């Protein structure tokens, strides 16, 4: 005997692709996470709520091309394009990670016309904590 499935959470009351675009954000924080494999750019407001994000993978880069500086530049300009339309004028930049896309993403952010109050490197550095993984032998 099968149980009847309730239709409480039907598709009719689910938002389809509509975002909160009416919010005006004069100041925000741009987080750049640059690893060797990918670069993720997230734009938040001052309280930390995500406004826009993009990565090299979502911009169409696949495989080893995701870690390139050009992919990071494309991801940064995609993430910033939406927040410039919402009225962002000033921003703080926090860069994390050792990847190749650090400088390229910062260059794209500078070119976007947003005034940068400061650029901070927030890469986590261990104070001799966990043992690192063994070195690769290629």
Curated annotation (Swiss-Prot):
GO terms for molecular function: rRNA binding; structural constituent of ribosome. It holds the Pfam family Ribosomal_S11. GO terms for cellular component: chloroplast; ribonucleoprotein complex; ribosome. Keywords: Chloroplast, Plastid, Ribonucleoprotein, Ribosomal protein, RNA-binding, rRNA-binding. InterPro entries: Ribosomal_uS11, Ribosomal_uS11_bac-type, Ribosomal_uS11_CS, Ribosomal_uS11_sf. It is found in: Plastid, Chloroplast. The keyword Plastid applies. One of its GO terms (biological process) is translation. Gene3D superfamilies: Ribosomal protein S11. Its main location: plastid. The keyword NADP does not apply. It comes from the Eukaryota. Belongs to the universal ribosomal protein uS11 family. HAMAP family: Ribosomal_uS11. Part of the 30S ribosomal subunit. This is Small ribosomal subunit protein uS11c. It comes from Nandina domestica. The gene is rps11.
């Amino acid at each position: 005997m099968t149980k009847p499935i309730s239709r409480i959470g039907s598709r009719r009351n689910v938002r389809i692709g509509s975002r909160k675009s009416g919010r005006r954000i004069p100041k925000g924080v741009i987080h750049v996470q640059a690893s060797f494999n990918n670069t993720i750019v997230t734009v938040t407001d001052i309280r930390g709520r995500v406004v826009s994000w993009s990565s090299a993978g979502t911009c169409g880069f696949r495989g080893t091309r995701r870690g390139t500086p050009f992919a990071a530049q494309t991801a940064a300009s995609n993430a910033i394009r939406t927040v410039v339309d919402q009225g962002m004028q000033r921003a703080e930049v926090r860069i994390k990670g050792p990847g190749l896309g650090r400088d390229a993403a910062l260059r794209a952010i500078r070119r976007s016309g947003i005034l940068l109050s400061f650029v901070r490197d927030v890469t986590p550095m261990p104070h001799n904590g966990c043992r690192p993984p063994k070195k690769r032998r290629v």
